[in-house]
Amino acid sequence: MNESGTLLQLIQENLDDFCDSRREDFSSISPDLVPVIDYTQSLLAGGKRFRALFCYWSWVGALSTAPVRQSEMERQASAAAMVGVSAALEMFHAAALVHDDLLDQSDTRRGAPAVHKRFEHLHSASGWAGSAERFGVAGSVLVGDLMLGWSSEIFGNALLAAPNTSIETSCRNEFSKMRVEVMAGQYLDVLEENSASTRSVDEAFGRANRVMLYKTAKYSIEAPLLIGAAFAGGEPGLLRGLSAFGIPLGMAFQLRDDILGVFGDPAVTGKPAGDDLREGKRTVLVALTLQGLTPSIGKIFEELLTSRELEPEQIAFMQQTITESGALAKTERMMEELADESLNALESLGIDSRAKENLKALALKVINREA
């Protein structure tokens, strides 16, 4: 097994051990809490682990630039701590997914029911009183909040092995900034879904870009890179270089996601075809589409986008409209340009070749993914 594969296995073991310990705590309180830990552990069992891998290889790269090399014992201790740091990022991401699916009213995640739907099904199957839907909402809010708290706990425990207090403080600052930025991005995303129809078409592109920057680019790629480098005591110049690599890559990552959200294969993505259209997502792809339509067609497209109840033929019409407007081709070009910008920035980083090669391989996976 290669180094990345070993890391992913160790992260899964870390998360499983953490959840098993919490299962004991919950069981001692009440057996009614078992579904909470079941749904949490199920969600943590899958995913691409991009954030963890970007964090780890950034740490490896930053270590190679350190003026004083670590001893083998110090490196092993730091590597063990990095597993915890990476696991915390994955716990945080899973929490964000729980809340994101609820906000988007998305019924599925990775081909299985979303957490709020699992709680809803539990309510219905148990024959309980009240609204199953409201129970699902309440359960998923609480599970997401719980996982956010657990991510901070795992992160804090990992930082106990930080080489010094300066590094510990830098890591905490980066983690805190990530939390603020992704929550801000989530709010702006919800805001756009509800307010975009009251704004001009000309405003849509800039506002969609802003959501993309904070909800995805900084959170998914830049923050893990900066946390990993900070844990290695990376210098400010290196962190700036990693941002120059991570932000355009994160933007390209989201543009790929936007395309998959409209044109992706459900068998691969685990979500229904055109799911972003049903959810009324105000993506860059949608903004470019509206810019390229006549007022009459634009009005029809806008009405469909805000309806939330779309038939398959309406999805097909919107997909065709997006393609014929030129928005799909423009989005793909943007993605390619951002990817080139990112890879050029990576090439200029003064880190060792092993870290650079692994970061490049990760970047290419992000850009070319099909799910």
What does each model-found stretch correspond to?
Residues 54, 151, 185, 286, ...:
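Residue-level signal for inorganic ion chemistry
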Residues 1-89, 94, 98-133, 186-206, ...:
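Conserved N-terminal diphosphate/IPP-binding helix and adjacent helical/loop segment
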Residues 30-31, 256-269, 297-305, 314-316, ...:
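A glycine-biased, small/acidic residue-tolerant capping/turn segment at secondary-structure junctions
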Residues 109-144, 196-217, 240-244, 266-292, ...:
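Divalent-cation-assisted or electrostatically stabilized phosphate/pyrophosphate-binding catalytic cores
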